[in-house]
Design a protein with these regions (language model features):
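Nucleic-acid endonuclease domains
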Residues: 1-51, 56-147
């Protein structure tokens, strides 16, 4: 991995919330030639298929070994750096890992593009909103409006 790619990767893992989401949205827009959304309830629009597109991504990090508490909070922060936790795709069967895709409101889009930023590659998946309820790990109980 050259220095520019490593710097980009490290930046992806450092971005938070809206800025992280914007990078993912721009990437999917460019890859699939989607246009801007028609309203604030989905991220992009597929003019060819006439579908509302939702885009959700997460970084993939090795699972934390301990729950944070008063006695280990500082130590846990020191161990939380990218070098210790970023997971390569080739390691996904060797370690438990954390990735979190939230606020999936099935009724507001037709197709979901969701992706995982590993340390060495990006995995992109596609699912129709009608398939989400049967997706392993999906919960519609986290946020109001997810039903």
């Amino acid at each position: 991995m050259n220095d520019e790619i490593k710097e980009f990767r490290d930046g992806i893992f450092a971005l938070r919330t809206r800025r992280f989401g914007t990078v993912a949205e721009l990437m999917i827009e460019a890859l699939y030639s989607f246009t801007k959304s028609h309203n604030q309830f989905h991220d992009r629009y597929d003019e060819v298929g006439h579908q509302r597109i939702e885009i959700k991504f997460s970084t993939v990090m090795k699972a934390n070994e301990a729950v944070i508490n008063r006695s280990n909070a500082i130590d846990q922060c020191k161990k939380a750096n990218l070098g210790n936790r970023a997971l390569n795709s080739t390691e996904m069967y060797e370690y438990d890992f954390d990735c979190n895709i939230q606020q999936v409101k099935r009724l507001e889009f037709d197709v979901l593009y969701y992706g995982l930023f590993f340390a060495d590659r990006i995995a992109i998946f596609k699912m129709h909103s009608s398939e989400i309820l049967s997706c392993f790990g999906y919960s519609d109980k986290q946020h109001k409006g997810n039903e």
